[in-house]
Amino acid sequence: MAKAPMRVAVTGAAGQIGYALLFRIAAGEMLGKDQPVILQLLEIPDEKAQKALKGVMMEIEDCAFPLLAGMEAHADPMTAFKDVDVALLVGARPRGPGMERKDLLSANAQIFTAQGKALNAVASRNVKVLVVGNPANTNAYIAMKSAPDLPRENFTAMLRLDHNRALSQIAAKTGKPVSSIEKLFVWGNHSPTMYADYRYATIDGQSVKDMINDPVWNNDVFLPTVGKRGAAIIEARGLSSAASAANAAIDHVRDWVLGSNGKIVTMGIPSNGDYEIPQDVMFGFPVTTANGKYEVVKGFEVDAYSREKINITLKELEEERAGVQHLLG
């Protein structure tokens, strides 16, 4: 028997990431090749943006995706989020020239407060929310705090792009395929302060740390390369990383919904106090996923170097959180 369609909301649907994302969702890459989807697409109520969204929808129609059971354009989150099972919050105020992340906080706080309230009011009670729009961790925190009737664990932030970037750098360094790397993960904020940790990673049972055996490379090359990759792509391409961000969003939701098959992945989730991260901080953790739920992988020892790195990214997140607290009422 055919499965009932799942409703997927995507905000900023006519943007670069939306364009790289929607066709793949409609093709079944995120929720499974047997899972029909209804796309509920949100753009700002600006005539140009709504017109662009219509154009994207025309293209999606022209793909004749067998799994696409419906598609709607919206300008209001209260209608866009009606009964949604998955919400990808991609749209955010972009960073302009000379703007710091801090400048983005208040502009985005308004957007994500409104979207959190709308999800609280009209989404499925089991909605899975992934925030992609930056600053992703704090935007996810704002949305979560604005949706008191939804379980807090339903709100997540995207660290999977950092995770995937780290995987590809380790693969290049070791000359091994990406698929052979296990137990690599990322702590903290989706920002240059994130801490990609391969101390426990293995390739075919061998320790990656022992294979590389180069703390200077780790500190001076690997971590800055992963942390500043987004800026390097803007520098090279003149546009921000859209296709790789869309790909990471698909990976994140696919694993959350369908399970990671025992593999450790990275998700930004509200802390329960694990690894001494204060309650409710939206933080990248090593997790495994099964049956639509994620679980923090406990028991990794945090050495002095790692604790220092984790504290730096935690401090940044706590500063961001303090910067929006007054906006949350």
UniProtKB/Swiss-Prot annotation:
GO biological process, one term: malate metabolic process
UniProtKB keywords: NAD, Oxidoreductase, Tricarboxylic acid cycle
Binding sites annotated in the UniProt record for substrate: R95, R101, N134, R165
Top-rank EC class of the record's enzyme: oxidoreductase
Family from the record: Belongs to the LDH/MDH superfamily. MDH type 2 family.
Positions of disulphide bridges: none
Name of the featured protein: Malate dehydrogenase
Residues annotated as catalytic: H190 (proton acceptor)
Function as written in the Swiss-Prot or TrEMBL entry: Catalyzes the reversible oxidation of malate to oxaloacetate.
EC number of this enzyme: 1.1.1.37
Reactions accelerated catalytically: (S)-malate + NAD(+) = oxaloacetate + NADH + H(+)
GO function terms (MF aspect): L-malate dehydrogenase (NAD+) activity
Any single Pfam family the record assigns to this protein: Ldh_1_C
Organism from which the protein derives: Ralstonia nicotianae (strain ATCC BAA-1114 / GMI1000)
Entry-linked Gene3D superfamilies: Lactate dehydrogenase/glycoside hydrolase, family 4, C-terminal, NAD(P)-binding Rossmann-like Domain
Entry binding sites for NAD(+): G12, A13, A14, G15, Q16, I17, G18, N108, Q115, V132, G133, N134
